Amino acid sequence: MGLSSEELEQAAHALSQAEKTRAPIVPLTEKFPGLDVEDAYGIQLHNVSDRLKAGETVRGYKVGLTAKAMRDQLGVDQPDFGHLFSSMILDTEAQFSAKDFIAPRVELEAAFVLSKDLKGPGITVADVLRATELVLPAIELIDSRIENWKIAFEDTVADNASAARVILGAQGASPRDLDLRLAGGALFRNGSLMETGSMVAVMGHPAVAVAWLANTLGRRGISFKAGDVVMPGSCIKAVDIRQGDVIHAEIAGLGCVDLSVS
């Protein structure tokens, strides 16, 4: 690791305050030129620990940068991950205030709701499908505590993979009842089609991303628990949202999900 414990704590505090005050900070990679990936995960886990001490509960996890184009843009060869707390996960038709975020964007994903524990390494796609009770259409609201989304890979890792909120649809399906690779999705903003995509864009199959995360977390001594929600990554490019927007999204075979921004 390139940062001292004091620098790591300073960086974690800066991100935490940015989220609370909605005042973004300069990229950590600029303020701490020696910041590496392990430092970045150390910063993320420091803030996770603080939230757990404050009484919050981890409800699941997210995978970011599952699209090869995004990884190429940041010069990395693997995705990243973040933690999802109970306070972040909401049901469809959720309403948000734009004032609660800095520069929010939305993505479309197929959320995996687990019925069994999973602990890597050694987890396969088949293991993931057997352990999944339901796959739901979901909107992930992402937000960067780094000003102007000027992020390097280490910045978004430290910033909990830019996680903010997850909105889950009400229907869904068993992943054993459809071929998720072929499921297409669409996201509308104020009635206008903004983005379309296919789940094959998520590492070939969203369950591949879930297996990757189970194995990555397993090497850190973390396991999925029954009831966890795992967000495998978006099938579309992120769409900016602002006050007054109404978002509708749908995934073939899974249903739809909505949110409005007040």
What label would you give each PLM region?
Residues 2-205, 242, 246, 254-262:
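Catalytic-core "active-site belt" of small-molecule-metabolizing enzymes
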Residues 210-238:
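A conserved acidic, glycine/proline-rich C-terminal tail/linker
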